[in-house]
Curated annotation (Swiss-Prot):
Domain of life: Bacteria
Listed NCBIfam families: EnoyACPredFabV (NF043048), PRK13656.1 (NF010177)
Family: Belongs to the TER reductase family.
Protein's gene: fabV
The EC number(s) this enzyme carries: 1.3.1.9
Organism of origin: Coxiella burnetii (strain CbuG_Q212) (Coxiella burnetii (strain Q212))
Keyword Oxidoreductase found: yes
Active site (UniProt): Y236 (proton donor)
Alphabetical keyword list: Fatty acid biosynthesis, Fatty acid metabolism, Lipid biosynthesis, Lipid metabolism, NAD, Oxidoreductase
Binding site residues for substrate: Y226
Its biological purpose: Involved in the final reduction of the elongation cycle of fatty acid synthesis (FAS II). Catalyzes the reduction of a carbon-carbon double bond in an enoyl moiety that is covalently linked to an acyl carrier protein (ACP).
Name this protein carries in UniProt: Enoyl-[acyl-carrier-protein] reductase [NADH]
Amino acid sequence: MIVQPKVRGFICTTAHPEGCARHVGEWINYAKQQPSLTGGPQKVLIIGASTGFGLASRIVAAFGAGAKTIGVFFERPASGKRTASPGWYNTAAFEKTALAAGLYAKSINGDAFSDEIKQQTIDLIQKDWQGGVDLVIYSIASPRRVHPRTGEIFNSVLKPIGQTYHNKTVDVMTGEVSPVSIEPATEKEIRDTEAVMGGDDWALWINALFKYNCLAEGVKTVAFTYIGPELTHAVYRNGTIGRAKLHLEKTARELDTQLESALSGQALISVNKALVTQASAAIPVVPLYISLLYKIMKEKNIHEGCIEQMWRLFKERLYSNQNIPTDSEGRIRIDDWEMREDVQAEIKRLWESINTGNVETLSDIAGYREDFYKLFGFGLNGIDYERGVEIEKAIPSITVTPENPE
């Protein structure tokens, strides 16, 4: 069938299989063109492996370091006239290319928050690898979590804490810049968001992997966070998500102590750059900030996407054969170029004057839109979008599909 983008709010409800495959191919080619990673990881588990930073780290591990990878995610296969979710197509393309290159790549589709999926993953690691996982990437962005022990359902929200937040935001599809007010979160919303986006599940994963002897001596585990400039702090760093991320950082310190004493291992937080992802598109204010950031970083020739960010994380931080450089809080900073004083000063200056009339010229909102569509496989060169495509794509390592996630 012919697949066109259908955008509702900040979500595109369709995905293009060939476009997603082309996008993954571009990332793989980038990783292959870099100098090979010496002393890189050999057996990598990526939790949240199908899009964004998770997918990019899987590609860098596989095609940059020749690592075997197992990816866990919750994606939807095609059904009837409904396309699969982008992460499904991404993984189908990744596995196919990895297998053709002689690389081990298997995936598990299901709720990473559940005990069942953790057990399935552990069984696969024991059966195929006999343990020895030397890198665990934790990259989950989810709106809800069912607690595996209590069955309690938590929903995450993006809200400020304490007082109503007033600023401006942009509708990226129309380019309309308008004022936005966001009501503060309740105590329950703060706790719920921490339960979904904090470090609780990361710790459950690492503890389970450790208990079943799946981790190698010297193992590293990395989770991702974002700090950003003061401009976004009220809605992000000082809001509900920021509170959850503080919990994630606290978890990193606890896991680091455990892994260090048991396996001479490390648990680390990587502070990444602001990028167009399905998750960031949902945050008010942030798309306008990213549109300005893209323009300035591109002008200064320091713009990076997910794959460039993950390459730099592996090459210059995790596997540089030096001590891993961190900030005063022990975090890896690959948001260093975004947070450069000259970049932030320019954004601050433009922020005051940006409006509907000048947003297309002052910012790179066109680049934002382009990246947004690319997440779903649209707008890629060399794809004929008027031609019908087969929307059912198999992921080689997945035979049965679980209940469709919403």
